[in-house]
């Protein structure tokens, strides 16, 4: 159809003024273009037929005609539908010599159908745009509501984090032995649970906001695309709808951009405050662990000092008993005619050799030799007595650690004295008699222990510092009663009996020395155990410090990830603004054209 305009200059009516006059006269007289075209066609045909009868040549011209130029594209776009139809009819006039009226009617019908199709398409696109615009509006409202929910969740999380920090500080200021420590610990646990729930709610709200923002952006872009497509329609009514929708869409894009900027600000602020809260919490935990490590370090040093002091004291006691043993052996030599000198020499040699070997290797062979007795006899007896005393002391209100220490020491002493009594009985009475007296000895020791333990507990509760002195007196008295009941007391003894008795006393002192050393080892072991527990707590606190450092590192990494999310949101907002600007420039160019 565009090239049809160029055919005007080639048509025959420009060379025949009567043909042109007949065509234009018919168009001017009738407003019905189809009828006018039909009449013009008939007039043209009649005129042309008359010319043929008159013998007029097509190349002849009675008057000079002015060459006309076809209208420009800009002029055609400014024409109304009636003007465009007039232009079309004018073009059709140039083809009347080559086409028939039926062809003209067919082309007019096609043109009218095309116009109606464009109109229907414009209306359909307008409906789609209105639907997309409504969806974009709903998505934008949902995005705004999600931002408000995120802000509320953030406020709840900040309050929970603050409450947790306060509870942690309160817990760190208390000692585990304080009455309110358990309540403070429960408050910390509850605050931690609330903070975790608030954090999860905040994360869910943030994710929902991100999804809502993405959905709102996609629907706004969909509306923009439909608007761009809608601008191609030629219907005037549709153009008015497009203009109104364009204004609404531009306002929605601006609103969406503002909401995205608000969300980016909230996310950035939340990320910074979350990192600050985590740092404050980790600093509080770190300070508490440092204080605990210092406390456990002091306890470890104190328990180690006690163990060393106990070891030194028991070493002195061993040396004193060893010296007394040597003296008793020498004195016994006077009554035995030197027979016990060998025992004294052996005892002295054994004592010196044991000290030398212990100094060189750190191991006492006397202690190693007595280990089976310690494991199968003394240790069970000490544990039985120690547990009984510990339970009784705890019943009187003594703390567990002090009760265990006192029970271990008293149990070791009573077991050692019991072993001395057994050895003396075996040496004096004989193995057979000792075997027969085993049951009686067990019963007597049981009665003695039953009498001894309440007295020890009573003295511990009443006199405190006089406990061990009076306890030893009662133990000695009890053992004297045991000897009396077993018939060990005699009249005046001969020299040989005195010497033998002194030798037995020396043997008992040696066993007592070993038992005392073992009791000292038990006490030292208690202190070493306490030191080990303090060291274990110290290592646990150190591990907690390492874990806190790991948590701090994870918080920094999370902060970096949140910053990436913020950057992506800023990029999306910039893209939306850029698309809006491009659409605005396109609309401006179209309006100028």
UniProtKB/Swiss-Prot annotation:
Protein name: SPI-1 type 3 secretion system translocon protein SctE
Topology in membrane: Multi-pass membrane protein
Database matches in Gene3D superfamilies: Nucleotidyltransferases domain 2
Pfam families: SseC, T3SSipB
Family annotation (InterPro entries): BipB-like_C (IPR006972), IpaB/BipB/SctE_N (IPR032391), T3SS_SctE/BipB (IPR003895)
Cleavable signal peptide: none
Localization per record: Secreted; Host membrane; Host cell
UniProt KW Transmembrane helix keyword: yes
Main location: secreted
Coiled-coil spans in chain: 151-208, 287-314
Keyword annotations from UniProtKB, A to Z: Coiled coil, Host membrane, Membrane, Secreted, Transmembrane, Transmembrane helix, Virulence
Job description of the protein: Component of the type III secretion system 1 (SPI-1 T3SS), also called injectisome, which is used to inject bacterial effector proteins into eukaryotic host cells. SipB/SctE1 and SipC/SctB are inserted into the host membrane where they form a pore and allow the translocation of effector proteins into the cytosol of target cells. Induces macrophage apoptosis either by binding and activating the proapoptotic enzyme caspase-1 (caspase-1 dependent), resulting in the release of interleukin-1 beta active form, or by disrupting mitochondria and inducing autophagy (caspase-1 independent). The former is dependent of its membrane-fusion activity.
TM annotation in the entry: 330-350, 409-429
Statement: the UniProt record of this protein carries the keyword Cell division: no
Superkingdom as given in the UniProt entry: Bacteria
UniProt similarity note: Belongs to the SctE/SipB/YopB family.
A GO CC annotation given for this chain: membrane
Assembly behavior: The core secretion machinery of the T3SS is composed of approximately 20 different proteins, including cytoplasmic components, a base, an export apparatus and a needle. This subunit is involved in the formation of a pore, called the translocon, in host membrane.
């Amino acid at each position: 159809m565009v090239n049809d305009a160029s055919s005007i200059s080639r048509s025959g009516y420009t060379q025949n003024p009567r043909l042109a006059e007949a065509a234009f006269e018919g168009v001017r007289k009738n407003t019905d273009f189809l009828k006018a075209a039909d009449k013009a066609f008939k007039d043209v045909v009649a005129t042309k037929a008359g010319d043929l009868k008159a013998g007029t040549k097509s190349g002849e011209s009675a008057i000079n005609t002015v060459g006309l130029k076809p209208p420009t594209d800009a002029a055609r776009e400014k024409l109304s539908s009636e003007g465009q139809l007039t232009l079309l009819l004018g073009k059709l006039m140039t083809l009347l010599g080559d086409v028939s009226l039926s062809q003209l009617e067919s082309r007019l019908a096609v043109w009218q159908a095309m116009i109606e199709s464009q109109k229907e398409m414009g209306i359909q696109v307008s409906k789609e745009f209105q639907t997309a615009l409504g969806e974009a509006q709903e998505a934008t409202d949902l995005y705004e509501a999600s931002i408000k929910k995120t802000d509320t969740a953030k406020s709840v999380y900040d309050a929970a984090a603050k409450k947790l920090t306060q509870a942690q500080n309160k817990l760190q200021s208390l000692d585990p032995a304080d009455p309110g420590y358990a309540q403070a610990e429960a408050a910390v646990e509850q605050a931690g649970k609330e903070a975790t729930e608030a954090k999860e709610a905040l994360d869910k709200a943030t994710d929902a906001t991100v999804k809502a923002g993405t959905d709102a952006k996609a629907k706004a872009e969909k509306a923009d695309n439909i608007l761009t497509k809608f601008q191609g329609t030629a219907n005037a009514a549709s153009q008015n709808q497009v203009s109104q929708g364009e204004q609404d869409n531009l306002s929605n894009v601006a609103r969406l951009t503002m909401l995205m900027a608000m969300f980016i600000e909230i996310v950035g602020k939340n990320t910074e405050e979350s990192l600050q809260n985590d740092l404050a919490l980790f600093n509080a935990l770190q300070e508490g662990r440092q204080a605990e490590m210092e406390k456990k370090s002091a306890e470890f040093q104190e328990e180690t000092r006690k163990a060393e002091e106990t070891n030194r004291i028991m070493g002195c006691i061993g040396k004193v008993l060893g010296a007394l043993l040597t003296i008793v052996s020498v004195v016994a030599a006077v009554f035995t005619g030197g027979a016990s000198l060998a025992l004294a020499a052996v005892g002295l040699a054994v004592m010196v050799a044991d000290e030398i070997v212990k100094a060189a290797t750190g191991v006492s062979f006397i202690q190693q030799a007595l280990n089976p007795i310690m494991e199968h006899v003394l240790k069970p007896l000490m544990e039985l007595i120690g547990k009984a005393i510990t339970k009784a002391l705890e019943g009187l209100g003594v703390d567990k650690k002090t009760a265990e220490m006192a029970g271990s020491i008293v149990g070791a002493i009573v077991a050692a004295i019991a072993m001395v009594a057994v050895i003396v009985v075996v040496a004096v009475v004989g193995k057979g008699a000792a075997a027969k007296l085993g049951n009686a000895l067990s019963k007597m020791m049981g009665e003695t222990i039953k009498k001894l333990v309440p007295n020890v507990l009573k003295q511990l509760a009443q006199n405190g510092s006089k406990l061990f002195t009076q306890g030893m007196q009662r133990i000695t008295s009890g053992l004297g009663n045991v000897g009396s009941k077993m018939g060990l007391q005699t009249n005046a003894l001969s020299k040989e009996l005195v010497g033998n008795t002194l030798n037995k006393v020396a043997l008992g002192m040696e066993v007592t020395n070993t038992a005392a050393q073992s009791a000292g080892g038990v006490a030292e072991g208690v202190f070493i155990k306490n030191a080990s527990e303090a060291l274990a707590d110290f290592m646990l606190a150190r591990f907690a410090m390492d874990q806190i450092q790991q948590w701090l590192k994870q918080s920094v990494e999370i902060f970096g990830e949140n910053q990436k999310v913020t950057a992506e949101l800023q990029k999306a907002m910039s893209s939306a603004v850029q698309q809006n600007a491009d659409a605005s420039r396109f609309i401006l160019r179209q309006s100028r054209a």
